[in-house]
């Protein structure tokens, strides 16, 4: 497989990595927890189930991943931040028990294979002023709780923007792969990060031991933490409904429904053969933010045609079983979304019996008008980069193409 290769790093990043030993940056589970306690003056991390995946992940970082110095600094900050949020969230729920009674009613979840339009669908539904979507700034720094009066002007938005700019300086090509910004809606894996039962940790790092644990783990604790975060975020800044998103939900729909039995789920559909080369290059670039030694072959083997087929078959089987009623599902095709986004979104509103006023349509159209495709440069990839046989892969997905009326793009 031919995989996207990064360009040279900025001189300052190279200088830091060459002159400072990453071993100087301690990644020890107990020391990280102690730092979070000292930072907050709090001691209760809440549900003890997080300790096992947290420790496995930290051990995996130390034993399996060759972090460069900048990468070690970034992950250390991420881990202390996640632990800090756990402490603050637990304390808030004790001091303000009314937060635990906040009702998360019929949230809309968007999921599908990666690169099938989940992000733009999420952003457009979030552009409806009645909707609430978790933004990067309030997930990175959720305390104090966001408030309606200052939501659009909170100083944490600018702080989050600066953090994201740092990522894009370390790997400049990263900017062209995704819309990024402090006030951009984020994936649920980030909301779930503090549970340590989340693709957030596996998606940024090549950590086989943690991945092995995660793939066999009960995902419900991740969604329980997710719901606690939503209760916190909506306490002083509510919306009519939550709109949420993550391709990772394709592998954990049962767990999602265990915590959100009334969830309404939008499944995005696109030719899997268009998806494959794009996903691998994004995984590679994300890992490269934190390590110079990224195994391209391992990345390619992590997300394969077999992986896609398993996820799609799992979705279809769940729906066929009746455990996920069709009244709670909507199928959104990428081709229709690209052709006429507002009309395509209209189908979601109609299916879920949500009113769709002109003000919502206008807000979404304005978002589209201010976000032309390719605005940040192109993320270029081609099926030929995979080294796979096109006809064989098309046959693999023939049932999927027919059932969900998906166009061939490769």
Walk through the language-model features, giving the residues of each.
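PAPS-dependent sulfation machinery
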Residues: 140-242
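Glycine-rich phosphate-binding P-loop
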Residues: 109-128
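Flexible loop/turn segments at secondary-structure boundaries
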Residues: 249-254, 273-276, 338-341
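Post-Walker A helix-loop "phosphate-sensing" segment adjacent to the P-loop in P-loop NTPases
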Residues: 127-137
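Short His-Asn-centered micro-motif
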Residues: 111-113, 243-247, 269, 334
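Conserved phosphate-donor/acceptor-positioning beta-strand/loop module used by diverse small-molecule
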Residues: 245, 256-281
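Pre-Walker A adenine-sensing motif
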Residues: 91-101
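PAPS-dependent sulfotransferases, especially Golgi type II membrane carbohydrate sulfotransferases
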Residues: 1-91, 206-223, 230-237, 279-331, ...
């Amino acid at each position: 497989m031919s995989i996207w290769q990064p360009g040279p790093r900025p001189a300052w990043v190279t200088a830091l990595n060459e002159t400072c030993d990453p071993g100087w940056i301690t990644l020890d589970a107990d020391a990280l927890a102690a730092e979070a306690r000292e930072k907050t003056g709090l001691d209760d991390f809440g549900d003890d189930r997080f300790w096992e995946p947290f420790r496995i992940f930290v051990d995996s970082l130390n034993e399996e991943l060759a972090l460069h110095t900048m990468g070690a600094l970034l992950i250390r900050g991420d881990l202390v931040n996640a632990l800090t949020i756990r402490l603050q969230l637990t304390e808030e729920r004790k001091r303000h028990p009314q937060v635990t009674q906040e009702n998360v009613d019929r949230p809309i979840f968007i999921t599908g294979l990666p690169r099938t339009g989940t992000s733009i669908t999420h952003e457009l539904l979030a552009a409806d002023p009645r909707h609430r979507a978790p933004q990067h700034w309030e997930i990175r720094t959720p305390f104090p709780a966001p408030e309606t009066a200052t939501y659009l002007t909170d100083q944490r938005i600018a702080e989050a923007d600066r953090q994201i700019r740092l990522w894009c300086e370390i790997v400049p090509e990263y900017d062209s792969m995704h819309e990024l910004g402090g006030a951009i809606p984020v994936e649920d894996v980030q909301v779930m990060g503090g549970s340590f039962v989340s693709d957030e940790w596996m998606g940024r790092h090549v950590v086989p031991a943690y991945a092995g644990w995660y793939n066999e783990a009960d995902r419900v604790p991740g969604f329980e933490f997710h719901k606690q975060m939503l209760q916190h975020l909506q306490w002083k800044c509510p919306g009519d409904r939550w709109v949420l998103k993550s391709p990772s939900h394709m592998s954990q729909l049962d767990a999602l429904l265990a915590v959100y039995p009334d969830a309404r789920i939008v499944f995005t559909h696109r030719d899997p053969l268009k998806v494959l080369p794009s996903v691998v290059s994004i995984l590679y670039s994300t890992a490269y933010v934190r390590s110079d030694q990224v195994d391209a072959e391992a990345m390619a083997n992590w997300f394969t045609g077999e992986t896609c087929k398993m996820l799609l078959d799992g979705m279809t089987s769940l729906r066929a079983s009746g455990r996920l009623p069709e009244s709670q599902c909507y199928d959104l095709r990428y081709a229709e979304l690209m052709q006429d986004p507002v009309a395509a979104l209209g189908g979601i509103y109609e299916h879920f019996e949500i009113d769709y006023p002109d003000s919502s349509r206008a807000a979404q159209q304005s978002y589209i008008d201010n976000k032309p495709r390719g605005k940040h440069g192109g993320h270029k990839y081609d099926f030929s980069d995979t080294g796979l046989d096109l006809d064989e892969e098309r046959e693999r997905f023939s049932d999927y193409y027919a059932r969900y009326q998906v166009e061939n793009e490769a």
